[in-house]
Amino acid sequence: IISTALYAIAHATEAKAALESALLDLEGKILNQPVWALFGQKSQARIPLSVSIANPDFEEDKQLLQKISADGVRLIKLKTGFKSHQFDIMRCEYIRKYHPELSLRVDFNQGLEAEEGLSRTLDLATFEPDFIEQPVRAHDYETMAKINRQCPVLLLADESVFGPEDVKKAISQNIAGGVSIKVMKSGGIKRARKTAQIAAKAGWSCYGGDMHETGLGHLPGVHLIASCPEITLGCEFYHARYYVIEDILSTKFPIDEGHVVVPDSPGLGFSPDIEKIDALSLK
């Protein structure tokens, strides 16, 4: 079924990932095994959680920073490039001064123009984040490679790399030193695993990204990382806990002391609340 879906239509990676996730959930329940076990051993039982700081109103994000710190979260990713450069610098300064307990990552989400990409990336590199993600447009491999050569901080590719085909090209052109791996972006767990394995073999670091998902959407990514030792930089499966008003899982998405807890129950490990889905559905 998946082989047919992969080639029946170009792109549509989220739909393909949803189909594969449903089939793997079914297979796991038939075999009485969690999805991660279908791929081998569990490499991580608890995955470090990163929460993104992305509100144009930084006063609201200051409250979020206090909350997640109290919850035991120790990784944050600052979304940058959507307002002024000074706004980005101000927030970096604030986080470094008032939240030294938090490890900082930076994500431009393609927010910089090519001509400003290097200088602004280097400015934020002075705050020594763990990595800086996708400063310029996805297709601009030339500028990504230029920044990668001169940036003292790990440069991560996101929108530039969707699946195995992209990561091979990205490695050959040396556009980064790491990649954000997403089940929905890659077109499923299997293709995401392959992308991570190719990247790691080339010496790249891998991070577990997501696509603004509910708890149900997070779960395939959890099983991906649990079964994939190549993904070492944690995950960003925070929406179900910190942003979704009402999640659609029957129980809370499993987060404990700043870590996502990998489920061991059959299939994806949690079931959707059908009554909630029905109530939230458009009719």
Functional labels for PLM-detected ranges:
Residues 25-34, 228-232:
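Short helix-capping/linker segments at secondary-structure and domain boundaries
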Residues 21, 26, 78-80, 108, ...:
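Generic detector of well-ordered alpha-helical packing
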Residues 122, 128, 139-156, 161-259:
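Shared catalytic-loop signature of beta/alpha-barrel
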Residues 1-30:
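Metal- or metallocofactor-binding catalytic centers and their adjacent structured scaffolds
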Residues 38-151:
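Metal-dependent enolase-superfamily TIM-barrel catalytic cores that perform enediolate-based chemistry
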Residues 241-283:
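C-terminal extensions of enzymes
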Residues 19, 32, 76, 107, ...:
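Conserved, mostly hydrophobic/aromatic
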Residues 28-29, 33-46, 260:
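N-terminal amphipathic alpha-helix/helix-capping segment at the start of soluble metabolic enzymes
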